[in-house]
From Swiss-Prot:
<keyword id="KW-0472">Membrane</keyword>
<dbReference type="GO" id="GO:0005886">
    <property type="term" value="C:plasma membrane"/>
</dbReference>
<dbReference type="InterPro" id="IPR020003">
    <property type="entry name" value="ATPase_a/bsu_AS"/>
</dbReference>
<keyword id="KW-1003">Cell membrane</keyword>
<comment type="subunit">
    <text>Has multiple subunits with at least A(3), B(3), C, D, E, F, H, I and proteolipid K(x).</text>
</comment>
<dbReference type="Pfam" id="PF22919">
    <property type="entry name" value="ATP-synt_VA_C"/>
</dbReference>
<keyword id="KW-0375">Hydrogen ion transport</keyword>
<keyword id="KW-0813">Transport</keyword>
<dbReference type="GO" id="GO:0042777">
    <property type="term" value="P:proton motive force-driven plasma membrane ATP synthesis"/>
</dbReference>
<dbReference type="InterPro" id="IPR004100">
    <property type="entry name" value="ATPase_F1/V1/A1_a/bsu_N"/>
</dbReference>
<dbReference type="GO" id="GO:0005524">
    <property type="term" value="F:ATP binding"/>
</dbReference>
<keyword id="KW-0406">Ion transport</keyword>
<comment type="function">
    <text>Component of the A-type ATP synthase that produces ATP from ADP in the presence of a proton gradient across the membrane. The B chain is a regulatory subunit.</text>
</comment>
<dbReference type="Pfam" id="PF02874">
    <property type="entry name" value="ATP-synt_ab_N"/>
</dbReference>
<protein>
    <recommendedName>
        <fullName>A-type ATP synthase subunit B</fullName>
    </recommendedName>
</protein>
<dbReference type="GO" id="GO:0046961">
    <property type="term" value="F:proton-transporting ATPase activity, rotational mechanism"/>
</dbReference>
<dbReference type="InterPro" id="IPR027417">
    <property type="entry name" value="P-loop_NTPase"/>
</dbReference>
Length: 466
């Protein structure tokens, strides 16, 4: 809707329910149009139109409807969408999804106002992701590589260290060779206060805050604000990527809270629920959010997205991870059994996948042996898991010598390759060298997926001889 539309004012509030209000006599309201509520004491609150039919507009108020008077409050329709002033100055700062500072710093003065709903990318101008992003986490870099412009979610479970992994990736991730032009936009959606405090302290103590822009809503914030959080964060990401030629990693945590907020608002509007009680348009809503990542022809910058979500009851078939998996290009799955062994990060590499990995690794991108080594590590670990199951039935004493070596490999693979400290930043060469160290525990005859030239070049037995 044009921003030249006249401001219309109404005092015909007919219904107040949770964060929603109904205003009668409105025939020209537009979906997502910004509204302003003037309270009886003169203070103002903002909201947006979420439905309009038969002359009745349904609006959701960001700050909630407590204190709104049906007779004394006025509602103004402003004829434009919600806009937030964004700027490079936001790096190193913490904001609400409305662009208000949460770090006791000044308001953003420079920059430009942008509609937080963004503009859809024309598929014909998208470029295919091909550049490797180094996260410093071996299980990701070595086996489920992240590429510039990719959407790669992390599926976590309640109590698993998704927050720590998200903070570590935000601190360490970089595009090799373009470190100075890389930044992180971090959207924390409906998290607890102690979690918000952890992220803030971690970024400040490690110095990572200087290249991170944070947008935070807490668990007790209205659902409408939680829904705005990723939209505002991605609006800043688009500005930095496509206007300032920066490479942006957008981390969205926790998308489960986002979907719960969608469900809460849908229930308030008395919409017919879909699968699991979530609104039928949740797939579309998630797609709109996730598809704001990518590379654009003619633009030097890019947006890479890592949505992080909590699987209710560790159920990967739950609607939220299920729909997320359809839209994104792979998944990184955190595993409770590894966590119980004391492995950090507890990434289940066999359940994890990066669909674009093959196009962003290898000679000239990471290292020439990367593809072969990752294939061999996957295959060996998968066989070791089968042998573990067999050993639980017949006992280790009944296993062959080769099978016992696979068990030793699996133990060392988990302890040395997957496991690392939260402040341990491994470059890709270190990751691959550790991979060779653990795969060398197997007889060379079992290393069948790696070309002989790479075995002669990188296998520890041959390196020592040199």
């Amino acid at each position: 809707m044009s921003t030249l539309m006249n401001i219309r004012e109404y005092n015909s509030i007919s219904m107040i329910k949770g964060p929603l209000m109904a205003i009668e006599g409105v025939t020209d309201a537009a979906y997502n149009e910004l509204i302003e509520v003037e309270m009886p004491d003169g203070s103002k609150r903002r909201g947006i139109v979420v439905d309009s039919q038969s002359g009745v507009a349904i609006v959701q108020v960001f700050e909630g409807t407590t204190g709104v008077s049906p007779t004394q409050s006025k509602v103004r329709f402003l004829g434009r969408g919600l806009e937030v002033k964004i700027s490079e100055e936001m790096l190193g700062r913490i904001f609400t999804p409305l662009g208000e500072p949460l770090d006791n710093g000044p308001q953003v003065l420079s920059g430009e106002k942008r509609d937080i709903n963004g503009s859809p990318l024309n598929p014909s101008v998208r470029e295919y992701p091909e550049e490797f992003i180094q996260t410093g986490v071996s299980a990701i870099d070595g086996l489920t590589s992240l590429l510039r412009g990719q959407k790669l979610p992390i599926f976590s479970g309640s109590g698993l260290p998704a927050n720590q992994l998200a903070a570590q990736i935000a601190k360490q991730a970089t595009v090799r060779g373009e470190e100075s032009n890389f930044a992180v936009v971090f959207a924390a959606i409906g998290i607890r206060y102690d979690e918000a405090l952890f992220f803030r302290r971690f970024f400040e103590e490690t110095g990572a805050i200087n290249r991170v822009a944070m947008f935070v809503t807490l668990a007790n914030d209205p659902p409408s604000l939680k829904i705005l959080t990723p939209k505002t964060a991605l609006t800043l990401a688009e500005y930095l990527a496509y206007e300032k030629d920066m490479h942006i990693l957008a981390i969205l945590i926790d998308m489960t809270n986002y979907c719960e907020a969608l469900r809460e608002l849908s229930a308030s509007k008395e919409e017919v629920p879909g699968r699991g009680g979530y609104p039928g348009y949740m797939y579309t809503d998630l797609a709109v959010t996730y598809e704001r990542a990518g590379k654009v022809r003619g633009k030097k910058g890019s947006i890479t997205q890592m949505p992080i979500l909590t699987m209710p009851n560790d159920d990967i078939t739950h609607p939220i991870p299920d729909l997320t998996g359809y839209i994104t290009e792979g998944q990184i799955v955190l595993d409770r059994s590894l966590f119980n062994k004391g492995i950090y990060p507890p990434i289940n590499v066999l359940a994890s996948l990066s669909r674009l990995m093959r196009d962003g690794i290898g000679e000239g991108k990471t290292r020439d042996d990367h593809k072969d080594l990752s294939n061999q590590l996957f295959a060996a670990y998968a066989r070791a898991q089968d042998i573990r199951g067999l050993a639980a039935i017949i006992g280790e004493d009944s296993l062959s010598d080769v099978d016992r070596k696979y068990l030793l490999f699996a133990e060392q693979f988990e302890r040395k390759f997957i496991n690392q400290g939260i402040n341990e930043n491994r470059d890709i060469e270190t990751t691959l060298d550790i991979g060779w160290e653990v795969i060398s525990m197997l007889p060379e005859s079992e290393i069948s997926l790696i070309r002989t030239e790479y075995i002669k070049k990188y296998h520890p037995n041959y390196r020592v001889k040199k």
